[in-house]
């Protein structure tokens, strides 16, 4: 189970929190929860959607705790995430990728989760609904708002870089 899914789960957590060590902690906690809950897995959803839900929830919980502990405004916290991304030795992206990741860092955590699952993981809204427990209609609206925010952020950066 760990060998099969750990890399995909790691990258989902990593896109949520941007920090390698934080993502590893989330994955470790997630797989502990999976191990404890596996006997109760009924198979109502696909295994990977169940795993994604656990990782997404762990990521959101982590972000809430980090935000609450730091007592930073959302904007300050987003800036902290951007700074972590820029300083990350594993990030070797170009300016466009950096702008995209910075834009994603400005999204509220739940919107970020929806955006990542749809844009990067290319999941269908029905699958995202299984993972998040959010209706398909709400997901479409959330993704649309996230997409517009990301697009406007990148256009704003492009305007100021000319």
Region locations from a protein language model:
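Internal acidic/polar
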Residues: 69-93
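C-terminal edge and immediately downstream basic/flexible tail or linker adjoining helix-turn-helix-like DNA-binding
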Residues: 18, 70-73, 99-101, 106, ...
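Structural recognition of an alpha-helix C-terminal capping motif at a helix-to-coil junction
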Residues: 11, 25-32, 45-57
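Sigma70-family region 2
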Residues: 15-18, 31-46, 65-67
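Short, charged helix-capping/linker segments at alpha-helix termini
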Residues: 10-29, 136, 157-162
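Amphipathic, Lys/Arg- and hydrophobic-enriched alpha-helical face
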Residues: 2-20, 37, 104, 153-156
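A short pre-motif secondary-structure segment
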Residues: 114-118
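Arg/Lys-rich amphipathic alpha helix in sigma70-family domain 2
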Residues: 40-42, 53-73
């Amino acid at each position: 189970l760990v060998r099969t899914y750990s890399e995909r789960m790691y990258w989902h957590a990593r896109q949520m929190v941007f920090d390698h060590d934080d993502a590893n902690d989330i994955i470790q906690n997630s797989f502990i929860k999976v191990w404890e809950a596996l006997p109760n897995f009924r198979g109502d959803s696909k295994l990977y959607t169940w795993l994604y839900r656990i990782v997404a929830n762990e990521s959101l919980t982590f972000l809430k705790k980090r935000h609450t502990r730091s007592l930073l405004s959302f904007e300050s916290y987003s800036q902290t995430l951007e700074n972590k991304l820029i300083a990350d030795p594993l990030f070797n992206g170009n300016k466009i990728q950096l702008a995209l990741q910075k834009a994603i860092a400005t999204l509220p955590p739940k919107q970020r989760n929806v955006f990542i699952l749809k844009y990067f993981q290319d999941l269908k809204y029905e699958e995202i609904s299984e993972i998040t427990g959010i209706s398909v209609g709400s997901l479409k609206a959330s993704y649309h708002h996230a997409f517009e925010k990301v697009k406007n952020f990148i256009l704003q950066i492009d305007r100021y870089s000319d």
